[in-house]
C-alpha cells in the first residue's frame, strides 16, 4: 500500500465529495458520487438515508461480484493553476456489521454534520487503496 503525500492527503480529507468507480458484470464502469472518509490506506463510504431509486444498489452488487474499485477526488477552479485530482485504486468489500462498520460510520459522522442527526444505517464499502495517482499543475 502506497502512502499519500501529506499535502494531497489534506486536500482529499477536506473534499466533501468523491466519485466511486466499480465494474458492472458486463465489464462497463459504474461511477457514482459519494460521501467518504479517508483513514490511512482506506477510503470508506456508506449507504445512507438519502433517497435511492432502489435498495439493491448497483455499487454494492458490483463490489460483491468483482471486488475492485477506484475513488476519485478532484477540485475544479476557473484558475486552472489550482486544478488537481487524486485517485486511489484498490480492492473493495462490503461490510454490513461489526466493529469495522461502526468505525467507518464514526469517521463519516465526524466528517459530515448531516450524519450527526442521521448516521448511515446501511452497508459500508471499504476500499483498501493499493495505488495512489495524482495530478496538479
Report the location of each language-model feature.
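Short solvent-exposed loop/turn micro-motifs enriched in small/polar/acidic residues
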Residues: 13-15, 28-29, 85, 118-120
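Short beta-strand segments
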Residues: 16-52, 71-73
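Charged, gly/pro-rich active-site loop segments
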Residues: 2-3, 76-137
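Short, basic/aromatic recognition patches
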Residues: 1-19
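Short coil-to-beta transition motif at edge beta-strands of beta-rich domains
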Residues: 14, 66-68
Amino acid at each position: 500500500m502506497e502512502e499519500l503525500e501529506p499535502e494531497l492527503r489534506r486536500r482529499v480529507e477536506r473534499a466533501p465529495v468523491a466519485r466511486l468507480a466499480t465494474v458492472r458484470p458486463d465489464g462497463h464502469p459504474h461511477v457514482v458520487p459519494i460521501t467518504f472518509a479517508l483513514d490511512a490506506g482506506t477510503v470508506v463510504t456508506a449507504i445512507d438515508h438519502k433517497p435511492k431509486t432502489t435498495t439493491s444498489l448497483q455499487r454494492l452488487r458490483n463490489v460483491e461480484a468483482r471486488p475492485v474499485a477506484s475513488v476519485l477526488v478532484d477540485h475544479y477552479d476557473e484558475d486552472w493553476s489550482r486544478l488537481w485530482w487524486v485517485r486511489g485504486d484498490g480492492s473493495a468489500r462490503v461490510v454490513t456489521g461489526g466493529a469495522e462498520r461502526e468505525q467507518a460510520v464514526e469517521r463519516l459522522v465526524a466528517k459530515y454534520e448531516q450524519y450527526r442527526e442521521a448516521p448511515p444505517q446501511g452497508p459500508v464499502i471499504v476500499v483498501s487503496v493499493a495505488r495512489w495517482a495524482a495530478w496538479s499543475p
